[in-house]
């Protein structure tokens, strides 16, 4: 027998219509899938605020011609070696590089790393994508 539990949800008609548009826009096949995803997202946010072990990816684009930029990036990465699991460097064009840093550890430390990398002069764009480490069903 499945561990799936059915329960009812009462919603205002306007909210339900907005939710159904959300489901269609995100290509969910049904409301249950969308609700499960939203619940997981909220539980994941809770993990990040409670300093539980988490995982994620930091991505940033930079001009590799910027003076001393690579040394600054490497210095910061070495300062946070305990949470960095892997890095991937991609040449986007002659001037721009994309770097993806896979991280796992304390969310406060990961956020500090992300902020430090994004704050370097020459980094054009950066973002932190959060995930869990498999604790959420």
Curated annotation (Swiss-Prot):
Keyword Nucleotide-binding part of the UniProt annotation: no
Cofactor note: Binds 1 nickel ion per subunit.
Keywords, ordered alphabetically: DNA-binding, Metal-binding, Nickel, Transcription, Transcription regulation
Domain of life: Bacteria
Residues reported in the UniProt entry to bind Ni(2+): 78, 89, 91, 97
GO molecular function: DNA binding; DNA-binding transcription factor activity; nickel cation binding
Pfam families xrefs: NikR_C, RHH_1
InterPro entries in the record: Acetolactate_synth/TF_NikR_C, ACT-like_dom_sf, Arc_rbn_hlx_hlx, CopG, CopG/NikR_regulator, Ni_resp_reg_NikR, Ribbon_hlx_hlx, TF_NikR_Ni-bd_C
Matches recorded under SUPFAM superfamilies: ACT-like, Ribbon-helix-helix
Cofactor entry: Ni(2+)
Single Gene Ontology BP annotation: response to nickel cation
Keyword DNA-binding in annotation: yes
Sequence similarity: Belongs to the transcriptional regulatory CopG/NikR family.
Primary role: Transcriptional regulator.
Protein name: Putative nickel-responsive regulator
UniProt source species: Syntrophus aciditrophicus (strain SB)
Lineage of origin: Bacteria, Pseudomonadati, Thermodesulfobacteriota, Syntrophia, Syntrophales
């Amino acid at each position: 027998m499945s561990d799936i539990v059915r329960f009812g949800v009462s919603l205002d008609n306007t909210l339900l219509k907005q939710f159904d548009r959300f489901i269609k826009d995100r290509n969910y096949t049904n409301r249950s899938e969308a609700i499960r995803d939203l619940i997981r997202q909220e539980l994941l946010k809770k993990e990040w605020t409670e300093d539980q072990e988490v995982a994620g990816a930091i991505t940033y684009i930079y001009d590799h011609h910027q003076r001393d930029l690579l040394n600054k990036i490497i210095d910061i990465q070495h300062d946070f070696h305990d949470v960095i699991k892997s890095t991937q460097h991609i040449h986007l064009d002659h001037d721009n590089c994309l770097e993806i840093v896979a991280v796992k550890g304390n969310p406060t430390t990961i956020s500090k790393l992300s902020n430090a990398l994004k704050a370097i002069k020459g980094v054009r764009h950066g973002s932190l994508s959060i995930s869990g480490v498999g604790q959420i069903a």
